Each structure stands twice: as structure tokens, then as C-alpha cells.
Amino acid sequence: MTQVHMTTGHAAAIAIDGADKVYPDGTHALQPVHLSIRQGEFVTLLGPSGCGKSTLLKMIAGLLPVDQGSIRVDGQPAGSPQKSDQSLAFVFQSPTLMPWATVQANVRLPLELQGVPSGEIGPRVEEALRLVGLQQFAQHLPNALSGGMQMRVSIARAFVTDPSLLLMDEPFGALDEITRHKLDGELLDIWRQRQITVVFVTHSIHEAVFLSSRVVMMAARPGRIVDELTIAEPYPRTQEFMVTPEFNVYARHLQHSLFRASEAQADAELS
């Protein structure tokens, strides 16, 4: 199989300039964050619980306001009414499917909410289900599907709007290891086909190295970026990549970064 390096555009799909978040109870969730993500990158936010990964992702989506600084998505403020909802999709930790509706109806919903003409909806839903291998399950209810298949429905629902930016908050964290590895590979295949920008949140160092073109390491109390690592390995990536010396070098680097950040946090709490 021919291996290629993914090319990314020079324009910033996401520009984060000093973004800060303090919750009403005074918790400093994020200290000022500076980060630029190029069009077509697959960037993973990695770190322990409480480091602000999900908070930052929701701020990029416009689901949480920025207290100070700014976040711009395709040149527009995050959450701006000028920003087309169609250009951004969010996949949550759980599939959040309507249990009374079929797989097909769940995937149709975003297009119906956007007012897409009914004649266009059917082919787009069919293509989204084909993308995740669920064409034969279109008329099934979610509770008849496994956890991995339900997450595939959630991914199809995200891609049916043809987004340019996909935000994913630990989508495979609750799945068994075999299913997680399979979905990681399928996600990379879709990303390479669509050439979109992905920001992915995980606790898993191995998942981050396998998926990413760049890993952003975060630490907690307050949430902040402590390291960035480019994964300069070609795509497509198979499971064999995970047992190579190169993979282990990347993983050890991130493990050491996480350990140093944890030590610094412990020292700060004792002082």
C-alpha cells in the first residue's frame, strides 16, 4: 500500500489567542491558551482528567463562552451567528441518539433541522451510512446495536452535514480495546478521504500517537498546554505502526511530558 504524508493548508482553521475560562464557582478551568490549528490537521488534545480538554473543545464549538482572549474558527469568532452551523460537527462521549427513532432517522435529523430540501436528504443519509458501514442497519433502532455501532451512527450523523471541522470528545473512551482500535482506523480513513480538520480529545497516549498529525499535551489546575508533538509518520497507519520503534519514541516523549506536568502540579499543591 502506498504511504503518503497528509498535506495541510497554511491558513488557520482555528486560531486560539489567550483564551481563558473561569467557572462561576471560581474554578480556573483554563489559563490563557494560545494554539493555531491548520486546515486539514488531525490534532489531539491529550491529558489527565480536569486539564480542560473538553472545556477547550466546547469553547471552540461555541458551546461555552470565552471569558478572555479569543477563539476564531475559519476567521469568525467561535459561536458567531455568521459562522455556518453546517461547517462544524461535534461528536460527544456518548452517542446521544434518539432511542425511539431508527438509525436512518437519527442521521437525517441535522439535515432536517437545517432545512435541507427533502430530495437531497435521502442520498446524503445513504452516503453517510455507507461511510461508516451501516447501510444494512438503516431501519434498526439504536438499542438493537452494539456500543461501537451506536458510535458509528453518531459519526455518520456528524458527517452527513459535510463539515469542514469535526470536534470529537473522547468518542471511543467507553468501548473495548478491539472496537476502539477498529474505529480509530476507520476514523483515519474517513479523515483522509474528506480532508477535513479534526480536533480529538483522549486520555490515551497510544490513541493520540496513532491518530494524530500533532498532539497537544495539557495539564491541570489550571488547564494549560505544556507540550506539543508533531507525529511525522506517513498515512495510512495500520495497527503494525503501534509496535514500531518510532511509535514507542513518540509515546515515551508524551509519557515523560505528562509525568513532568503531574510532578509540577503536585509540587504546586504542596507549596
Language-model features: where?
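Short hydrophobic beta-strand elements within the C-terminal catalytic ATPase subdomain
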Residues: V73, M217-M218
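Short, glycine/charged-rich "phosphate-handling" switch motifs in NTP-dependent
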Residues: R214
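ABC family nucleotide-binding domain
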Residues: H5-H206, L211
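Non-catalytic connector elements of ABC transporters
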Residues: T2-Q3, E240-S271
